Amino acid sequence: MVAPSLPDIVVYDTPGQDIPIWSHHTLRVLYALHRKGLPYAIVPLEYPDIEATFEPTSLLPKDDPVERYEIPVVLFRSRGGPNSDPDEYLMEPARIIAKLDTLVPNPPLPFASPRATEARTIFGPALAPILQIAVGYVPSVLSARSREGFLAKRQARWGKPLDVWVAERPQNKLLETAAPRLQAFADWLEGNGLQGPFIEGAQSGYADMTIVSILEYARLVGATDAFDAAMAHPRIARLYATLVEKDQMAARPPQVATIC
């Protein structure tokens, strides 16, 4: 029996003006692709063009009247070989990474293991204030056209302009909220009893990529105080550094492609 050929992988993403990748959702997917050793190309897509690009495709929209489609979208494009699957569009990092696990089972990227599930209950609240801080910086990294679309979507979702939403959540208060939560997560990591820097020990998984992608997002958009607050904890900094630096996740520039 002839094994199915792996598809070409195309990642649609909204770039920044000066930084090609900034979204924590996209970073999470790229980390997974690097971990699997899978090549990919990136197609840049301005924020207002997202819906018009994917509405004619087989990608099923979300049940969300504000954002029916969200970046990143990954196209698994068939190479047309024996037993190849048809083209498939996917969005939402968890679904995309589950697909990658079916294409290349090793190394696995556990999502719902007992340790990853427990970790999520601790790092989720710890990183929520960092996400709230970072979103206020996003418009400054976008092109004028994408910035306009991003701000319109945020206002539609929150019922108020982004700058008003941010002003209601002062950064110093969010950092105060984050401080004990980050400490609790660092203590949990330190006391995990496993060898290695990651949640499962020596092997990085989906949860580790989620954590690092959020920290990188904060750093890339300019939320330096939020990033530094997390990195002040040596155990969190170790997880981050091992994933980004030792595994060289950020040192492999993707091919930028256009799709006809």
Give residue spans per PLM region.
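Acidic carboxylate-rich catalytic motifs and surrounding loops in phosphoryl-/glycosyl-chemistry enzymes
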Residues: V43-P48, I199-S204, P253-T258
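GST-like domain detector, emphasizing the conserved glutathione-binding G-site
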Residues: V2-A152
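Eukaryotic N-terminal targeting leaders
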Residues: M1-V10, E245-C260
